[in-house]
Regions:
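Hydrophobic beta-strand segments within beta-rich accessory/binding domains
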Residues: 323, 359, 399-402, 410-412
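Bacterial N-terminal signal peptides that target proteins for export
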Residues: 1-11
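C-terminal segment of classical bacterial N-terminal signal peptides
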Residues: 16-23
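Carbohydrate-active catalytic/glycan-binding domains of CAZyme proteins
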Residues: 25-331, 338-345, 372-398, 407
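Beta-strand repeat architectures
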Residues: 329-332, 355-363, 389-392, 414-416
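Short beta-strand segments that buttress and anchor functional surface loops
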Residues: 316, 350, 401-403
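Intrinsically disordered, low-complexity Ser/Thr- and acidic-rich flexible linkers and loops
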Residues: 336-340, 348-359
Length: 417
């Protein structure tokens, strides 16, 4: 079976994968980017834009390569779809770029993100926020939220040089709402983004230092508020205006410096988060796009782990039994010891049952599956590997599931699909 998106979404709701051996895998292609925008889907493709202009494109969400087009240069863009158009916000300078904290945030529209489309054309940029050299805020690192409760559009911006600020934009024009005043909502972070869930607004900020490869200390933290304007408070009651923030994701899996959070909703109850990692050790320390499951625990977002290739027990989450081939149980030979009699013979570990011990007893052709008590037997051990050149879905490849050491693949249907 090739484990496609639908199978994953349905299967993981009822199954738990217990890892017995592992191999981490990362996205393929050339996913090199810094300060990525929230991922957008447009006409069946995925797009994200980064610092310096340009961006990445993916046909399936797994293989990423260059080709995205975003004029204006500058830093740390973000994107949101409003109706049938895409609004892009980016920073012209700021963050110490050009020698100071003077900067501005601009917005522009496009009907499509596909540079090969005849409809591809950006509007002229509009300035919506600015900062001067001696100001206690940098106009950089834009984050966009289209509020699902009332349709209002919000822009957060700023760096650890000063305050994170919030302004309201007109969702019809992308311009700053007339008379709107900035609101300070956080300090000691940058690259903020806002999301809404179940009556709470969540402010995700990137804490720590950037732009130093494997030495970057970036991590993503979060606070929440009942009002979009704050105050944002973490799980310990600390205000983000006083440096609070609960950890969402830090370094791991030989990748350091996660920053620049973005949310992508795959389906009801299924969410992914995007970010960059300042240094991927397995890619020479380059900055790469990262995509992780976004999980929720006690009302707080936390990054899930990337699914790892390996050999697993596949366990029913509801009943706790293990998925297994429906084959005859093969008894293991062992030396019997009477419980009530003294036995001075040396203790020798039993060897586990091997595939060679049982495979000749298995029928040829298709074999049904069932659930049963897990006894770490060969008919209960499943190896899950990415399908070479098989494509993928947002943040992962398609997988094949076989009994360990065999080519007996798990099929989703009786027709071997």
């Amino acid at each position: 079976m090739i484990m496609k998106t639908k199978a994953i979404l349905l299967g993981t709701a009822a199954l738990m994968f217990v890892l017995t051996s592992e191999k981490a895998i990362a996205q393929i292609g050339t996913p090199y980017i810094h300060d990525p925008s929230t991922i957008m889907e447009c006409d069946g493709k995925y797009y994200t834009f980064g610092t310096g202009g340009g961006g990445l494109i993916s046909e399936d969400g797994w293989t990423w390569n260059g080709g995205g087009v975003r004029p204006g240069g500058g830093a740390a863009p973000d994107a949101v779809k409003i109706g049938d158009r895409y609004l892009i916000a980016y920073s012209a300078t700021g963050g110490g770029l050009g020698g100071g904290h003077s900067g501005k945030v601009l917005t522009m529209w496009n009907k499509t993100l596909d540079p090969n489309s005849p409809d591809f054309k950006y509007t002229e940029p509009i300035e919506v926020a600015s900062s001067v050299n001696d100001e206690d805020c940098d106009a950089i690192d834009a984050g966009l939220l289209l509020d699902p409760t009332d349709g209002r559009l919000w822009l957060s911006y700023g760096t650890y040089f000063g305050f994170i600020r919030l302004v309201e934009l007109d969702p019809a024009t992308g311009k700053r709402m007339e008379g709107n005043k900035e609101i300070d909502i956080a300090i000691d972070c940058e690259a903020t983004d806002l999301i809404y869930r179940d009556g709470w607004y969540y402010l995700l900020g990137t804490h720590g230092t950037c732009c130093d490869g494997p030495n970057s200390t970036y991590n993503i933290v979060v606070g929440r508020s009942r009002k979009v304007t704050g105050p944002y408070v973490d799980n310990m009651g600390r205000k983000m205006l006083e440096g609070g923030g609960k950890m969402v994701i830090a370094a791991g899996n030989r990748q350091t410096g996660p920053g620049h959070f973005g949310l992508f909703k795959v389906a009801d109850g299924v969410e992914k988060m995007s970010c960059h990692f300042e240094a991927d050790f397995d890619r020479g320390g380059r900055s790469v796009l990262g995509i992780r499951p976004l999980l929720w625990k006690n009302g707080w977002p936390v990054a899930g782990e990337v699914f790892k290739e390996g050999t697993y027990e596949i366990e029913s989450e509801r009943r706790g039994y293990a998925l297994e081939l429906a084959v005859d149980f093969v008894r293991m030979e062992y030396t019997r010891h009477r419980f009530w009699e003294k036995d001075d013979t040396p203790v020798v570990p039993l060897k586990s049952q091997t595939l060679e011990d049982v495979i000749e007893t298995w029928p040829q052709g298709k074999i049904n599956v069932r659930i049963g008590d897990y006894m770490f037997r060969p008919h209960q051990k499943w190896t899950i590997t990415a399908v070479p050149d098989g494509g993928g879905y947002l943040g992962g490849p398609y997988y094949k599931i076989v009994i360990e050491g065999t080519n007996r693949a798990l099929a989703a249907t009786a027709d071997a699909e």
